Amino acid sequence: MKLFGTDGVRGKAGEKLSAQTSMRLAMAAGIYFRKTSATNVILVGKDTRKSGYMIETAIVAGLTAVGYNVLQIGPMPTPAIAFLTENMRCDAGIMISASHNPYYDNGIKFFDSFGNKLDETIEAEIEKIFYDDELIANAQKTMTEIGANKRIDDVIGRYIVQIKNSFPKELNLKNLRVVLDVANGAAYKVAPTVFSELGADVIVINNEPNGSNINQNCGALHPEDLASEVKRLRADIGFAFDGDADRLVVVDENGEVVHGDAILGSLAAFLHEQKALKGGAIVATVMSNAALDDYLKAHKIKLLRSNVGDKYVLEMMKENGINFGGEQSGHVIFNDYAKTGDGLVTSMQVVAMMLKKGKKASEIFGELKPYPQILLNLKITEKKPLDKIEGLKELEASLAKEGIRSLFRYSGTENLIRLLLEGKNQTLVEKRMDEVEKFFVKALNA
């Protein structure tokens, strides 16, 4: 069975992600990282899910069994783990989170000593070790060679300083009213602290994690509460994080949820004006709206498109010497400050842009009007290779002929196919989506 998906290992806690699997995966990772070890220390963090305690304990057992020392830092955002792994000179970092998924799911993702997500070749090597009984048995240490673990509570300050350093020193957030929805997740302490220390009037919602309310009708996937609070409190802006705070959703002062591509476009144009956009280009994914292309062209900025997943965005950014990119879903990467999508860094850049431009959020983000786009997640029973589906090429050609951009791809973690259609005529896009849905229902026995 394949372990790694598009973002680490993910599944239902206690089922696919059991204590046994977690411990063995940690042992396999430990064996791999020992080959290039510099400090013999691995950092482990988690979000606020109840199952995080079980998985954390199993991971610590697995790592110490193969001789690694472990630093446990408790609930912290995913980008904090990436930053602290490098900052604290660890051999690797491990984050226990299923991001925006419900509380009963969990996941394990790894970072190398520089705070980068692992590429697929390394994941494949760890997976190979995971299934090698002899190698795992022989790697287990005894007596004084068994590793030690230490729980540390004071590292949050290092990450807060890093976030504040991404905000222009000549600015402050006095007279700015901000509503934060921390999704009962990993940002529940750090996000309010950062905004308060910079002088904002901060209102926080969904900040009482109990182990099972993470992402529950709140946060980046459910910004409705945030939108109504921003309006009710006459706030200047609202920010919603997901469970591990690597993505951000923005709500303007009118309570309108800002389109993810409008965030990317506006920030790219702002960086370009500030002469801070390297390479005169940004990276977005194949999911991004064609209106983003047109908006960036008007600002003389080039758009490169990667596969879906922030690690692929980052890969393309590195290959092309680009320092800004992201996904429509709210993963935004400022490579000057972070190695992965970071909701807090993004929120800092958004408020800095508002202050420097002297404009309201709605005025800035209203400049990019996305073309009608429909995304449908269709449950399926089998994942046939797309190039083997009869009639699909003809369907794509007929859509293109009508000026409709199409993208069909399987979810890396669930039995779903994601169907995306985009065009300038809403009615036509809706009509064709009905046909596309029926086509895939028949083709994949959904």
Swiss-Prot record:
InterPro entries: A-D-PHexomutase_a/b/a-I, A-D-PHexomutase_a/b/a-I/II/III, A-D-PHexomutase_a/b/a-II, A-D-PHexomutase_a/b/a-III, A-D-PHexomutase_C, A-D-PHexomutase_C_sf, A-D-PHexomutase_CS, Alpha-D-phosphohexomutase_SF. It catalyses: alpha-D-glucosamine 1-phosphate = D-glucosamine 6-phosphate. Activated by phosphorylation. Keywords: Isomerase, Magnesium, Metal-binding, Phosphoprotein. HAMAP family: GlmM_B. One of its GO terms (molecular function) is magnesium ion binding. The active site is at 99 (phosphoserine intermediate). It comes from Campylobacter concisus (strain 13826). The modification Phosphoserine is found at residue 99. The gene is glmM. Catalyzes the conversion of glucosamine-6-phosphate to glucosamine-1-phosphate. Binds 1 Mg(2+) ion per subunit. Its cofactor is Mg(2+). Belongs to the phosphohexose mutase family. One of its GO terms (cellular component) is cytosol. Signal peptide: none annotated. Mg(2+) binds at residues 99, 242, 244, 246. Disulfide bonds: none annotated. Its EC number is 5.4.2.10. GO terms for biological process: carbohydrate metabolic process; peptidoglycan biosynthetic process; UDP-N-acetylglucosamine biosynthetic process. This is Phosphoglucosamine mutase.
